[in-house]
Amino acid sequence: GEFNPAWGYRFNENKLLLDPYAKAISGKCRNDDNLLLAYDVNAPGKDLTLDDRDSSRVMPKGVVMGDDFDWQGDRHPDLQLNDLIIYEVHAKGFTAHKSSGVKNPGTYLGFIEKIPYLKELGVNAVELLPVHEYYVEDFLIQKGLTNYWGYNTIGFFAPESSYGTETSPGCQVREFKTMVRELHRAGIEVILDVVFNHSAEGNELGPTVCFRGIDNRSYYLLTGPRDAPRRYYMNYTGCGNSMNLAAAPVIRLVLDSLR
């Protein structure tokens, strides 16, 4: 690939990239020493300059997952929209506090333990706030904070790993599927809040961990002055970038994720 940011090409062979279709991600992105940035932060040209340091030691890795999960004949309840009583909920926050009384607080399995409570409320659908794998922005980490809500997706096919009960690769996938299966068994629909309008890579000064390094010009809406017509990102989302939902690869990714 080519590294010519002024024209929208941001491939850097020194930066390990996540597979956009990874079904599970092991580890979290850590921008130690700015290794996730494809450019030299100390150079006058900033994002126009190439950083040749290897990022592999601070990058999470995609996990190959089999399709052998036992759904036990699961089917979603198929309730009519006008019959839904929807409970919007954060998958972790629902049981994170010790007062929830669950064995595994703040996890997919802990969520299962509260199904009787949902039934008692008369709820027949849960709308989960983002459960895709997400990236915690550098400026938050520097302040000792985190992105609690998860609206900063980096893996549109991978359940958030920190909501699993173990750190073993793929645990989060099995436990997420178990949660969905048991909610369906209880007659509760599962609705996902998904965020396809932007990714966690931010603007031109953000990390290069996936889409930007693979095909920046296809995945994102770009703009710029005459001498650098695709250097910058259209920021309709207020999150640094906007996914190019007119491009075939992006349309395909979104539809595949929804399916």
Residue ranges, per PLM feature:
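The feature marks proteins involved in alpha-glucan
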Residues: 1-84, 97-100
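Conserved, well-structured core segments
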Residues: 87
